[in-house]
Amino acid sequence: MDEMLMITNYSDFLLRSILKKKVARDACLLPWALALLMVSACAAEKVTPSLLEIRPQHEKEWEANPRDVANVLNATAQELWIYFPQRKLPPINVVPKGGPITLFERGPNGEIQIKLNTGKTFWAQYAYQFSHELCHALCDCKPHENPNHWFEESLCETASLFTLRKMAGTWNTAPPYPNWKDYSKSLNAYADERIKLGKLPAGTSFPRWFADNERDMRLNSVDRARNNIVAGVLLPLFEADPKMWEAVTYLNTEKLTKLYSLKQYFEAWSRNSEPRHRAFIASVTKQFDE
């Protein structure tokens, strides 16, 4: 940070010095000084995400090389975590069996506890399940009576699709190991298969489909067929503006009762979010309007 401040201060001094001199004499230096200011400003604005500590547990149950397991889980998490520059999370304990689920209860030292249902070298399945559960942690999931919880489930399904597609691109150029480059195809294929499951019935618009299905989703939030369809609508929004993943931080800020409508739910989300997120939340809300 001190180096950034030194660069910025020097750039300011240089620009002031140039402007005090005759324009004709120093015109050749002015573009250079302006460019330096722009670079230093960008450097000052850049925020490095805090470290995310992921702890694979029950080593033998993974039936895979522990180092490989850790690499896959960390690679998965980073595709989302980079969009939370101000966020901090406690360590995350991950076990391969008993889920997939993110427990409301924390570990003995406040750790987030995630259970998957995977193992061996099914890396695409690791990524799919872990990114979904990590999204619940990022949404600050907690015990609730919220009948709109289906939206969080759909949002976390969106996170899985987003992560798989991002990882495929990353691994195609910078895999954890050089010989893992071809796994990028498996990641893409896994995402494509899930996206196909989320296709709307022919001739049906999403608002019409939602009007016909909302009641059932309020009664059963974990309905993967319906969650997939909602995720298919949300995915293009997040891929167009991935910085907006940060907005899920505020999804559960307000304690909601079982009487909340979807409109009230979105209003609470927007109200508790940062101003920079509200236009995006409005665009999400609009998808559900007839």
Where would I find each of the regions flagged by the language model?
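Post-HExxH zinc-binding segment in Zn-dependent metallohydrolases
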Residues: 149-195
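Short pre-active-site segment immediately N-terminal to the catalytic Zn-binding motif
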Residues: 114-129, 143-147
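Pan-zinc metallopeptidase signature
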Residues: 199-290
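Active-site recognition of the HExxH zinc-binding catalytic motif
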Residues: 128-144, 157
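Auxiliary, metal-adjacent structural segments of Zn-dependent hydrolase domains
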Residues: 52-121
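Bacterial Sec-dependent signal peptides at the C-terminal "C-region" and cleavage site
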Residues: 39-47
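N-terminal secretory signal peptides that target proteins for export/translocation
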Residues: 1-24
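Bacterial N-terminal signal peptides
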Residues: 29-39
